Amino acid sequence: MLKECLENVRKNSPLIHNITNYVTVNDCTNILLACGASPIMADDINEVEEITSICNGLNINIGTLNSRTINSMHKAGWTANRLSHAVLLDPVGVGASELRIRTAVELVKNIKFDVIRGNISEIKTLANGSGSTRGVDADIRDSITEENLTEYVKFAKQLSKNMDAIIAISGVIDIVADSKDAYVIYNGHKIMSKITGSGCMLSAFTTAYLAANKDNKLLATVAAFCAMGVAGEIAQKRMGELDGNASFRNYLIDAIYNMTGEQLEAMAKYEKR
């Protein structure tokens, strides 16, 4: 199943429109190219409708939010919805400021998202409509563990029903859920938290999988999460004594570029809940 999702991205080469943050825009571009998709980054309101129209998917990321891009996000989202394109929201650091939470809530209210992806602190804040997160990182008190996993799976399913979107929570343990089914994913490595943009890359990457696998968006999201986690494991194994987080980032992108469907199926660690 996962193999087909990966191969569909390579075969269809979806064009993904990213209104993302300028800290990680280069990494998002490269991860999309590595998986076989094509990226475009455009956020001026005078062209977003045209750009969105020629694309297959839209990735909205509020990491470096500003008044100019908020309007562009709404216009691009409405256009993508009208054309039935895949749309993903990454509410980066949503609880860090009033502007972020207000913007994220308005985006969810006015745009139909296929997937909302974030760490557990971001997802909980968005669910509550208020709160705080530790910058763009998950609060340690919110960590998903084996002890609270059942509780968080139930939470993700209910939130999916409330928001009419797949809820994709990334962390040491990942949860991907719609209102009926949930998948728990155990791939990845702790060093992934030591590079800026690993979450942003995952969002862009997941949008490509959604765009290329529109018939099963839940499985497409699971496949993207597994593939990124597997790539993290492969990248970590390549690291030498003098390699650091910059080398790891490059190895991560290389692992996505070289990954086969068979490799993904063999290394993916996930279960249905």
Give residue ranges: language-model regions.
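Conserved N-terminal subdomain of the carbohydrate kinase-like
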Residues: 2-89
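Electropositive phosphate-/nucleotide-binding environments in soluble metabolic enzymes
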Residues: 3, 22-26, 42-45, 67-70, ...
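Glycine/small-residue-rich loop that forms an oxyanion/phosphate-binding "nest" at active or ligand-binding sites
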Residues: 69-118
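Conserved phosphate/ATP/ADP-binding segment of small-molecule kinases
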Residues: 100-182
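Short pre-catalytic strand/loop immediately N-terminal to key active-site residues, enriched for Gly-Thr
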Residues: 185-196
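Conserved post-catalytic alpha-helical subdomain immediately downstream of the catalytic base
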Residues: 196, 206-248
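Charged C-terminal helix
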Residues: 230-273
